[in-house]
Structures are given as structure tokens and as C-alpha cells.
Amino acid sequence: MANERWILAPGQRVTFARFMELALYHPQLGYYARPRGAYPAGPEGDFVTAPTAHPLFAALWAEILAALRERRGQPLTFVDLGAGDGRFLRNLAGFLDAQTVARLMAVEVSPAGREAMAASLPQVELAASLAELSPSEGPCVIFASELYDALPCHLLEGTEGGLCELYVEASEDGTLRLVADNPSTSELSAYL
């Protein structure tokens, strides 16, 4: 990451979860705060994922949703968690009929992503968090293809001495390294 030195002052240490949160979601410098298209897809740029690679993926999901609607006997609500700029939802909306999905909803933490969706998908209810969405009645499909790889997480390591957590620490010259130490919270040990 080009701006990694801003995240930690020399000698500062944070959990990997906190570092990941800052690197992805910092309002000015985080990965998801950058303007859309700043890193075009390809070897020198951003990665390509199934929802954005080809409209065929959305066509497949439209067929799945139509079958679910038929089976349930009522229109569905479709929620895309981590919707990005809405490319998948734009493709999906083009394949859906009005009888299949009653509501299209998107959760996206990036203001730039929500802005892009607001401009091109007026029929989609947008929110920065799941808690901001109004409740849905009837069957609901939660789609989270782009979400799980962007959830901050703790890095843990089992050693002969017990459970350790890996922290990100900045050296005096600003380079980052992983340092093992006691878990940041007892909840981590209790969970495992």
C-alpha cells in the first residue's frame, strides 16, 4: 500500500484487525475511500471478481432468484452486502422482471460506491451499514460475494506457550512488521 506510513507512527502497534480496518476504510486514505476507477482492473491495477467480471454471473443469479420466487410464491428482497459501485446490481436489474424482486437493497461503506450507485441505480435502497436498512417482510436473499475478504480480522497463532496474536508494528524507519504478543482481548482465547 503506497500510504502505509501514515497508518502507524514509528514504534506504534495495533492489532491486525485495526490495521486492516484503517487500510480499507480510513475516510481519506483507505482502499475503499479512493475514487472509483483509480486502479483499473488488470495486472498493474485492481483485482477482478466474479460479480464484476461478466454480466453472465448476474444472469445466473436472476435465474436463481426467479426459481426462489416461484417456490416461495411471493416477490423477494435482495440485499447486496459490500456492493461496491453497484456493477453487479446494475447487471442483475437488467435480467430481473418486476415480479421476482420487490426490493433491491445495497450496503456499501464507501461513500464513492454509494454515490456511484445512487447515480445509476435509483431503484436500489442504499445504506452504509445493515442497521440503516429498513426491515423487509417476506423472503430475503443476502448476497455477500464481495464482503468477506474485506472484513477486518485478528491474526492468531498457536504456539507451544499458548495462543498469540500478531500485531502490526511500525519500525523507526516506518516499515511495518508483524509482532507476536498476548491476545488483545480475552474474548479471542475464549472463542477458540
What are these regions, as identified by a protein language model?
Residues M1-L81, D85-P139:
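Rossmann-like AdoMet
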Residues W6, S134-L192:
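Class I S-adenosyl-L-methionine
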